[in-house]
């Protein structure tokens, strides 16, 4: 049935990300961060000091040949994978476990309004009904996407709630995962770039003792503080 097809698809998506993310739950594992754009590859590795402060241990940036990525990163997998190997070696990063950010252009991000539901009702609606098809107009089949959602706010008076909807094409997720694996690395975490930046800012805001913090973006096109 159609409902069974949707449930199976949802289960497959959860399995794909569950297998990757569960590997990152081991506290003793080291993980390096990777950012790949059509112009460059950036890698970094952090560590925590005894007083629970983050320390930037290793970092490296490598420019890519635009002539070789003119058709996009995904179409240049082999070249990008080799360049990623060199970037990791230049930074002297030895861990194979990595977290990778996916460009915003590879994701659909929207805030949608839905009827007010409990968490359980929302989960059931996602698994058994065409909730996202009704709330979000996608050009492709929803089964081709990996979907993340988070409730932003509930309005009991209006009997509505706002939900953050994020969808990444499974083909893009698999392509970025393939590039990382071709470089001999193990992708344990994947997230959309704008959310990785927000998480970094949120973590910096939690630092005590009122230390001044800055969020710095270094790139070939975007450089901001």
Segments predicted by a language model, with ranges:
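Residue-level detector of flexible, active-site-proximal loop/helix-junction positions
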Residues: 50, 63-68, 194-196
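Short, glycine- and charge-enriched coil/turn segments that flank and shape catalytic ligand pockets
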Residues: 50-52, 70-79, 153-160, 204-210
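Active-site neighborhood for divalent-cation/phosphate handling
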Residues: 97-203
């Amino acid at each position: 049935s159609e409902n069974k097809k949707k449930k199976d698809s949802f289960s497959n998506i959860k399995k794909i990300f569950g297998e990757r993310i569960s590997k990152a739950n081991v506290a003793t594992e080291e993980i390096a961060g990777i950012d790949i754009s059509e112009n460059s590859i950036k890698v970094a590795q952090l560590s925590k000091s005894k007083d629970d402060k983050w320390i930037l241990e290793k970092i490296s940036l490598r420019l890519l040949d635009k002539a070789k990525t003119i058709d996009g990163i995904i179409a240049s997998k082999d070249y990008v994978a080799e360049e990623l190997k060199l970037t990791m070696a230049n930074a002297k990063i030895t861990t194979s476990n990595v977290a990778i950010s996916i460009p915003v252009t590879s994701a659909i991000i929207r805030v949608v309004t839905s009827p007010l539901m409990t968490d359980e009702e929302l989960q059931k609606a996602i698994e058994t009904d065409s909730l996202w098809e009704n709330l979000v107009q996608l050009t492709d089949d929803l089964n081709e996407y990996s979907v993340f959602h988070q409730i932003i706010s509930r309005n009991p008076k209006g009997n509505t709630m706002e939900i953050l909807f994020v969808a990444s094409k499974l083909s893009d997720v698999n392509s970025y995962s393939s590039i990382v694996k071709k470089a001999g690395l193990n992708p344990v975490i994947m997230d959309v770039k704008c959310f990785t930046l927000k998480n970094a800012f949120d973590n910096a805001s939690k630092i005590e003792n009122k230390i001044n913090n800055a969020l710095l973006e270094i790139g070939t096109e975007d450089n901001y503080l």
